[in-house]
């Protein structure tokens, strides 16, 4: 126990006193506790505002709100439940954005200092910033493994869980009053803390604020997970990034261990294994190990208890799956991945005796999930539920070049993102739907027929949807046309993709152009 206490002993000076007492003084307590705020009738324009809200503008806004509260009390407002007219969203968003900017300052400075020490290592691995770099990691490290723990990280149901998580990083009490005010307001009005979709927390009216809170929640979860993982492994990781700037860590881990057994060392030996890999993107994580299903079940039991007892979140049964890598698919980052055994028969002959030797070659296969992609196209009104292309009536007022450019952009980004697929047939199906939908949209605009329109436009238009990616590869390999065609049919991983394709998220289809 003393050994682990030494590892977990951190400097309490890393706790931060944020700038709220200096900037806002008593206004924070007024916002958090003064119910007169709900009786305010402040007229405010609905005009746009700068997303980069400064702390000065937020301070002025809070001062105006505080003054108007007293004016409304003296005026004896006849409608006490009227909340800042129809501009409640504007006030909350302005203040919460200023809150996000300020709380990010100490974490950003700490992160920059940490990255400066890793500058030489990062210069050698700058390509690893791409999402596609995860799949070569799968190919190199997962091909000899057998079991995968597919995990969906649950979100905190109660706002107080987020506030408590935030308290481990700071000691400024006024910050918690303001944070609690925003969380309860958003939770009561919009239920943003328990989103129906896994990624709807990122598409709220203030994504920066909730993104910061969500990352704090995941960081809290992974810091405990990585500590126990490193202590239980024979090959311990040398990275200390997930553990910097934590307080009261030892007591939390000790309480967590008491849920399982009384002896910390007896608990850790249950998970000792030399080969284990962990990968996460947003709210989905993958934990892979070799042929030890008992070990994976114990890690599943550990994660469920961690969420239930430490984060007070009830984990649904469908959030953790134990899959066999060579029998089940892993749905990760818009790809369906699994291991595959290819048998290679070799004929060997010694003198008069001939032998047939079967060699099993292990490969990692990645394919495009056709059904979710068709579901996204159906939601975006490019096809029906059966996958039959339909026209896009909302673009009928646009020019022909604009409509064609929109469809081409979607196809180009889709081909670019799914270029690592082992089988291109599903990708061709999606591009066919978009191609026919583009034609039908133009036909509907010109009130013509498909045959007449294609005859006037020519067949070159249709070929562009299929030759765009091959043209890009021919520019990369100008002297080897055969090489570019072979790469186009095979798997290609790009190192310039820094965010997941919106089509994969199944929420929206439009992609930001490069």
Curated annotation (Swiss-Prot):
<comment type="similarity">
    <text>Belongs to the intron maturase 2 family. MatK subfamily.</text>
</comment>
<dbReference type="Pfam" id="PF01348">
    <property type="entry name" value="Intron_maturas2"/>
</dbReference>
<protein>
    <recommendedName>
        <fullName>Maturase K</fullName>
    </recommendedName>
</protein>
<keyword id="KW-0150">Chloroplast</keyword>
<dbReference type="Pfam" id="PF01824">
    <property type="entry name" value="MatK_N"/>
</dbReference>
<dbReference type="InterPro" id="IPR002866">
    <property type="entry name" value="Maturase_MatK"/>
</dbReference>
<dbReference type="GO" id="GO:0008033">
    <property type="term" value="P:tRNA processing"/>
</dbReference>
<dbReference type="InterPro" id="IPR024942">
    <property type="entry name" value="Maturase_MatK_N"/>
</dbReference>
<keyword id="KW-0694">RNA-binding</keyword>
<dbReference type="GO" id="GO:0003723">
    <property type="term" value="F:RNA binding"/>
</dbReference>
<keyword id="KW-0819">tRNA processing</keyword>
<dbReference type="GO" id="GO:0008380">
    <property type="term" value="P:RNA splicing"/>
</dbReference>
<keyword id="KW-0934">Plastid</keyword>
<keyword id="KW-0507">mRNA processing</keyword>
<comment type="function">
    <text>Usually encoded in the trnK tRNA gene intron. Probably assists in splicing its own and other chloroplast group II introns.</text>
</comment>
<dbReference type="GO" id="GO:0006397">
    <property type="term" value="P:mRNA processing"/>
</dbReference>
<dbReference type="GO" id="GO:0009507">
    <property type="term" value="C:chloroplast"/>
</dbReference>
<dbReference type="InterPro" id="IPR024937">
    <property type="entry name" value="Domain_X"/>
</dbReference>
């Amino acid at each position: 126990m003393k050994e682990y206490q030494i590892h977990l002993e951190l400097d309490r000076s890393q706790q931060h006193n944020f700038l709220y007492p200096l900037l806002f003084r008593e206004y924070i307590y007024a916002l958090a506790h003064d119910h007169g705020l709900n009786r305010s009738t402040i007229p405010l324009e609905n005009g746009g505002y700068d997303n980069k809200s400064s702390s000065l503008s937020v301070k002025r806004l809070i001062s105006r709100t505080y003054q108007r509260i007293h004016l409304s009390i003296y005026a004896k407002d006849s409608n006490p439940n009227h909340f800042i007219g129809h501009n409640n969203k504007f006030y909350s968003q302005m203040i919460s954005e200023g809150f996000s900017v300020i709380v990010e300052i100490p974490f950003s400075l700490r992160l920059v200092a940490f990255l400066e020490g890793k500058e030489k290592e990062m210069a050698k691995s700058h390509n690893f910033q791409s999402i596609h770099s995860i799949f070569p990691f799968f190919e190199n490290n997962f091909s000899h493994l057998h079991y995968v723990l597919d995990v969906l990280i649950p979100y905190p149901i109660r706002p107080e869980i987020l506030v408590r998580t935030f308290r481990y990083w700071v000691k400024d009490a006024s910050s918690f009053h303001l944070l609690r005010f925003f969380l309860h307001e958003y939770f009561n009005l919009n239920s943003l803390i328990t989103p129906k979709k896994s990624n709807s927390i990122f598409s709220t009216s203030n994504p920066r604020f909730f993104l910061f809170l969500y990352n704090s929640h995941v960081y809290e979860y992974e810091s405990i997970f990585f500590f126990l993982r490193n202590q239980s492994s024979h090959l311990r990781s040398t990275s200390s990034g997930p553990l910097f700037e934590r307080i009261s860590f030892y007591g939390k881990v000790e309480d967590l261990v008491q849920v399982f057994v009384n002896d910390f060392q007896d608990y850790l030996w249950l998970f000792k294994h030399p080969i284990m890999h962990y990968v996460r993107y947003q709210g989905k994580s993958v934990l892979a190990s070799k042929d030890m299903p008992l070990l994976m079940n114990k890690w599943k039991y550990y994660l469920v208890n961690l969420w239930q007892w430490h984060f007070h979140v009830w984990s649904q049964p469908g959030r953790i799956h134990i899959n066999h890598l060579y029998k089940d698919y892993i749905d990760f980052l818009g790809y369906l991945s699994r291991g595959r055994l290819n048998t290679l028969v070799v004929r060997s002959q010694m003198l008069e005796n001939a032998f047939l030797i079967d060699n099993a070659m292990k490969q990692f296969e990645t394919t495009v999930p056709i059904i979710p992609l068709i579901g996204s196209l159906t939601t975006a009104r490019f096809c029906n539920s059966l996958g039959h292309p339909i026209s896009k009536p909302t673009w009928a007022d646009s020019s022909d070049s604009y409509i064609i450019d929109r469809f081409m952009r979607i196809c180009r980004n889709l081909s670019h993102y799914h270029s690592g697929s082992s089988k291109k047939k599903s990708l061709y199906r999606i591009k066919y739907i978009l191609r026919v939908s583009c034609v039908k949209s133009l036909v509907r605009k010109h009130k013509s027929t498909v045959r007449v329109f294609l005859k006037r436009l020519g067949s070159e238009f249709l070929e562009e949807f299929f030759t765009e990616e091959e043209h890009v590869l021919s520019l990369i390999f100008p002297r080897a046309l055969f090489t570019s065609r072979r790469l186009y049919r095979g798997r290609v991983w790009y190192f310039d993709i820094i965010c997941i394709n919106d089509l994969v998220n199944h929420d929206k289809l439009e992609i930001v152009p490069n």
